[in-house]
């Protein structure tokens, strides 16, 4: 779809001059150079994003949760009933799920988006971008057509950009869908070139005696559909799912506005791999929240070149890790904007020079 290609070509480059200025500012704060570690690096990364205009700050916050069912559930790769997707999506509208509680704590709004739940009628309270009642069974057919993937990508990109126009400056991504770690593993295996046995995990507490079947399903899906690892849309359409496409769309939409996206867990890593194949320019806008406990997490993150800020043994999904990490983003902005400067008190510390302080 040409409109997507045109939009991806307009993703702004990171402002290296703004990052250099931010580095000098951070080095001149009331502290030894580097003593706030990754918070300093995060503040400098944010300063380089054109959407924040050189000064790290957080306006409105939003977690976009993509909800969809998966045909591959029929292969016995998940123990939860498929109906749980719809039930939990409805619970999200009541604010009672994990991501909703954590997002409320962070002061973020949760946008629950139906991109492919298998119900006869749309669920009240959800944003309706449904493509179909669940994706195809990737063990026997593609997840969707390329046209469906591109249309959903564009819809989510446009929705994300509209939120940015309305003041959202920090995005988080999440998902909801029974059996969705299976297509996620297929994406990770395809793009990283690693064998499914290395990336397939237990998902939502799959018994270990069923893991061999899940690995076999992922291997069959890749062999049958032959996704092109260099083509992110092709990978998503052939072995992905509507929720994974939606997450990729948020990343592309936010990056096109020069704004950061907090990743969540394994599903978001898989979507990020596909999105970065579409546009490597989005990578500096991706901020990893936590290390998922899912087996292939480190493989995916290593391929992305990302190191998460938290390691909480979490694997809930939903965007829970992204919501939890929003306070870290705000902390990085706070030190940048609110700490005093050494030069104002005529303090020179080892590692700081007078020229540094006055620059």
UniProtKB/Swiss-Prot annotation:
Active site (record annotation): 318
Magnesium listed as a keyword: no
Enzyme class label: transferase
GO BP term, example: cobalamin biosynthetic process
Enzyme Commission (EC) number: 2.4.2.21
Pathway(s) this gene product operates in, as recorded in its UniProt entry: Nucleoside biosynthesis; alpha-ribazole biosynthesis; alpha-ribazole from 5,6-dimethylbenzimidazole: step 1/2
Catalytic activity: 5,6-dimethylbenzimidazole + nicotinate beta-D-ribonucleotide = alpha-ribazole 5'-phosphate + nicotinate + H(+)
Keyword terms: Cobalamin biosynthesis, Glycosyltransferase, Transferase
Superkingdom of origin: Bacteria
GO molecular function: nicotinate-nucleotide-dimethylbenzimidazole phosphoribosyltransferase activity
Stated role: Catalyzes the synthesis of alpha-ribazole-5'-phosphate from nicotinate mononucleotide (NAMN) and 5,6-dimethylbenzimidazole (DMB).
Family: Belongs to the CobT family.
Oligomeric form and interacting partners: Homodimer.
Name recorded for this polypeptide: Nicotinate-nucleotide--dimethylbenzimidazole phosphoribosyltransferase
Source organism (scientific name): Shigella flexneri
Source organism phylogeny: Bacteria, Pseudomonadati, Pseudomonadota, Gammaproteobacteria, Enterobacterales
């Amino acid at each position: 779809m040409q409109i997507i290609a045109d939009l991806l070509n307009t993703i702004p480059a990171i402002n290296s001059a703004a990052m250099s200025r931010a580095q000098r500012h951070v080095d001149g704060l009331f502290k030894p150079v580097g003593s706030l570690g990754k918070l300093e690096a995060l503040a400098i990364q944010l300063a380089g994003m054109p959407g924040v205009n050189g000064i790290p700050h957080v306006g409105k916050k939003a977690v976009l949760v993509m909800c969809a069912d998966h045909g591959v559930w029929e292969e016995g790769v998940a123990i939860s009933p498929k109906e749980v997707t719809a039930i939990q999506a409805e619970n999200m509208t009541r604010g009672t799920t994990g991501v909703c509680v954590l997002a409320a704590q962070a002061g973020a709004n949760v946008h629950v988006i139906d991109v492919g739940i298998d119900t006869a009628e749309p669920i009240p309270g959800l944003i309706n971008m449904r493509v179909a009642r669940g994706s195809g069974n990737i063990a026997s057919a593609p997840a969707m057509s390329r046209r469906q993937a591109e249309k959903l990508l564009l819809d989510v990109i446009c929705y994300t950009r509209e939120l940015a126009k309305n003041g959202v400056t920090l995005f988080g991504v999440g998902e909801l869908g029974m059996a969705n770690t299976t297509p996620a593993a297929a994406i990770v295996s395809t793009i990283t070139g690693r064998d499914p046995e290395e990336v397939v995990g237990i998902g939502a507490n799959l018994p270990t005696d069923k893991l061999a079947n899940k690995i076999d399903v992922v291997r069959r899906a890749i062999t049958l559909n032959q996704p092109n690892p260099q083509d992110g849309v092709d990978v998503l359409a052939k072995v992905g799912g509507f929720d994974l496409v939606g997450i990729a769309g948020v990343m592309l939409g936010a990056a096109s506005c020069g704004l950061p996206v907090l990743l969540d867990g394994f599903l978001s890593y898989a979507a990020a791999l596909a999105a970065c194949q579409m546009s490597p320019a989005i990578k500096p806008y991706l901020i990893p929240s936590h290390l998922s406990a899912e087996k292939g997490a480190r493989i995916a993150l290593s391929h992305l070149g990302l190191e998460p800020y938290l390691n909480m043994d979490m694997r809930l999904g939903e965007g829970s890790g992204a919501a939890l990490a929003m306070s870290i983003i705000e902390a990085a902005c706070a030190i940048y904007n609110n700490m005093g400067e050494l030069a104002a008190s005529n303090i020179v510390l080892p590692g700081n020079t007078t020229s540094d302080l006055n620059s």
